[in-house]
Amino acid sequence: MASALYACTKCHQRYPFEELSQGQQLCKECRIAHPIVKCTYCRSEFQQESKTNTICKKCAQNVKQFGTPKPCQYCNIIAAFIGTKCQRCTNSEKKYGPPQTCEQCKQQCAFDRKEEGRRKVDGKLLCWLCTLSYKRVLQKTKEQRKSLGSTHSNSSSSSLTEKDQHHSKHHHHHHHHHRHSSSHHKISSLSPEPEQGIWKQSHKSSTVIQNETPKKKPKLEFKPSNGDSSSINQSTDSGGTDNFVLISQLKEEVMSLKRLLQQRDQTILEKDKKLTELKADFQYQENNLRTKMNGMDKAHKDFVEQLQGKNRELLKQVAALSKGKKFDKSGSILTSP
C-alpha cells in the first residue's frame, strides 16, 4: 500500500510527510532556497523570499509609510518607526507597565509578564531577545538529552540481552548437572553394591563444580561495576550537557553584546551625523547673520550720510533765506522818505 503524499506550501509538489518541515511544511529544496532568517529591524524570524531581502513584510510596509526607523529607547532594537519606542515595547508597556532591568543583558527593557511568562523561562525576568535565546538553549539541551537517552537505552538493552544470554547458559549448565545427579541417584537406588564408587564420583563432580563456581563468580560480580561505569558515563554526559548549556549561553551573551555594540555604534554614527548637520546649519546661519549685519550697517551709514547731506542743504537754504530777509529790510528803509 502506497504512503500518502503531502503538498509543499511553496512549490506545491507532493512529498512524504517525513520529508516536509514541521512548522512551514516545506520540502528540502524550498527550505534551502527560502531559509528562515531574522529581520534586520525588528529581529523577528521570517521566511526569506530572495537573498537580498533582509527585512520582513511588516517592516517593509512601515519603511514605505514612515521611513527608516530609529533605535528604541528601551530595547535598542532599530524598530521605532513612530516616536522613540518600537511597537513591541509600546504594547508591552500598555499591557504590563513600565520596563524593568533584564537579568541577562542588564538593559531596562524587560516587562514583568507575571507567572505565566516567567514559567516558560524558569522564573527569570528576561527581555524579548534574551527569552528567545534562552528558549533556543533549552530546546538544544532537550534534543541532546533525548539523543543521549536513546543511546543509553540502546546500550542498556544490549547489556541486558548479554546478561540474559549468560543467565540462560548458566541455567542450562545447572539443569544438565541436575539431570546427571538424578541419573546417578537412580543408578544408586537400582544397584546398592557400587554405591561408594558412585558417591565418590558424584562427590568429585560436586567438588569440581564448587571449584568452578568461584571462577564464574567474578564475572557475575563484575556486572555492578559495569552499572557503575554507566552511571559514571551518565554523570560525565550530564556534566557535558551542562557545559554545553553554559557555552551556548555565553555564545548568546556574546551575540547580544555584539548586537548592542552595533546598535550603539549606529546610534553614535547617527548622533555624529546630527552634530555635523547642526554645525553646518549653525555656520550657515552665522554667515547669513553676518551678511545681514554688514548690509544693515552699510545701509545705516548710507542713510546717515544722506541725512547729513540734507541737513547741510537745509542749513544753506536757511542761511540764504536769512540773508535775503536782511537785504529786503535795508532796501525798504532806503526808499521810504
Curated annotation (Swiss-Prot):
Keyword field: Coiled coil
Comp. bias intervals (Polar residues): 226-241
Start and end residues of each stretch annotated as Disordered: 143-241
Bias kind Low complexity: ranges: 147-159
Basic residues: compositionally biased ranges: 166-187
Ranges annotated as spanning the membrane: none
Pfam families according to UniProt: FAM76
A cellular component term, taken from the record's GO annotations: nuclear speck
UniProt keyword annotation of Coiled coil present: yes
Biased composition (Basic and acidic residues): 213-222
Keyword match Cell membrane: no
Function per UniProt: Plays a role in hematopoiesis and immune system development, and participates in the inflammatory response.
Entry's family note: Belongs to the FAM76 family.
Record-given protein name: Protein FAM76B
Organism in which the protein naturally occurs: Xenopus tropicalis (Western clawed frog)
